[in-house]
């Protein structure tokens, strides 16, 4: 609604609109702080040797966060794993994603742990039952006209595209 029309509205309606807007802003701010705190808690798992239950919790958190971010941007949101994240952590989380989506179908490919050549120096993501290089996937999505955003997970931080200020390190 344009400001020119807003000023002609009755006082009660203007106050309600302002109140609703401020309430939405507070809710958004609260969610961003909750996401920031959760990211901070989960980033500590990337530096240690997490237990299977901690890896499961990390996987569920990242999946939920990706769903939320995808809804906020009205597009696909994937988890980009930087090369500095220990292989045992990122592959375990991707295995968990695969199990949730497909069960044990094609699990042999993911369990081999040698999906990508060791000399590959690229960030990876799990998409549609496959572990793929992000650069190759970006080229494919661009050619198809599909917009995608990433939650970037590195050894020291989890970065979301929600707010560029939310970089937890």
UniProtKB/Swiss-Prot annotation:
The keyword Cytoplasm does not apply. A motif (LXCXE motif, interaction with host RBR) lies at residues 110-114. Residues 9-22 are annotated as: Binding to host SKP1 protein. Keywords: Host-virus interaction. It comes from the Viruses. Interacts with and disrupts the function of host retinoblastoma-related proteins RBR, which are key regulators of the cell cycle. Induces transcriptional activation of E2F-regulated S-phase and G2/M-phase-specific genes. Inactivation of the ability of RBR to arrest the cell cycle leads to the stimulation of viral DNA replication. Belongs to the nanovirus Clink protein family. Interacts with host SKP1. Interacts (via LXCXE domain) with host retinoblastoma-related protein 1 (RBR1). Interacts (via LXCXE domain) with retinoblastoma-related proteins (RBR). This is Cell cycle link protein. The lineage of its organism: Viruses, Monodnaviria, Shotokuvirae, Cressdnaviricota, Arfiviricetes. The gene is DNA-C.
